[in-house]
A protein has these predicted regions:
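Peripheral, non-AAA+ core regions of ATP-driven protein-machinery
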Residues: 1-66, 73-223
Length: 223
């Protein structure tokens, strides 16, 4: 009988390594530990969010900070998107760190519901740091990164994005992590708003749909 199963993940040319629990008889699963390979060996990163977003470029379209929760640990990550006209008959779509099929679905939603004409665009997506995330709550960050690159409008660096438009779990932890790292604005699903509306020190923008979220983040229009 196996008590615990751990996966050791990491890209070959990346200094960060992940230890992910997928089975644990004595605690929760899907917990994540982040380590860095140094001259003394693997060293735990006590605040991985700060390190993983520290090199985020300023005023660059297609880059957005997203909030995710792995197990019970909230983390902020940088989502990067590049959208450019295709040179081929069929547009190329590449996703690193996120589920490829889910990205395809979100692109279809952007075309149908938001009206972005990306059917003839190559789309490249990447989560910085070599981390793979399957949580549905990053969907909103994905579509905003794509829209930002497509419109060539940079996302305000003081804004973080948490959750899909439906309510997400651990909303208090996500907002606390954003506040800890100095973010002053955050976009969340409206269904989560009542729980956190009295939070001090950060401006909370609730959204009902993708179009509204994109207009707020890229255009500053809260209506």
């Amino acid at each position: 009988m196996v008590d615990t199963v751990l996966y050791f993940e990491g890209e070959r040319y990346n200094t960060y390594r992940l230890v992910r629990a997928v089975k644990n008889r004595f605690g929760s699963t899907n917990e994540l530990g982040v380590f860095e390979m140094r001259d003394l060996g693997l060293v735990e990163l006590e605040n991985p969010s700060k390190i993983l977003i520290s090199e985020k470029p300023k005023d660059v379209a297609g880059s957005v900070i997203i909030s995710t929760v792995e197990g019970t640990r909230p983390m902020l990550l940088e989502m990067q998107a590049l959208v450019s006209p295709t040179s081929y008959g069929i547009p190329k779509r590449t996703a690193t760190g996120v589920d490829y099929n889910r990205v395809g679905m979100l692109l279809a939603v952007l075309e149908k519901r938001v009206g972005l004409q990306i059917q003839n665009q190559d789309v490249y997506l990447n989560i910085v740091g070599g981390i793979k995330i399957n949580e549905p709550s990053i969907d909103l960050g994905i579509v905003i990164a794509i829209a930002s690159s497509f419109r060539n409008v940079a996302v305000d660096e003081t804004i973080a994005v948490t959750g899909e438009v439906r309510a997400v779990s651990f909303i208090e932890k996500r907002i606390a992590e954003c506040k800890k790292l100095g973010f002053t604005k955050i976009v969340i699903p409206r269904n989560n708003y009542e729980v956190v509306k009295d939070t001090k020190g950060i401006e909370i923008w609730p959204v009902d749909n993708l179009r509204q979220a994109i207009n707020i983040v890229l255009g500053g229009n809260k209506e």
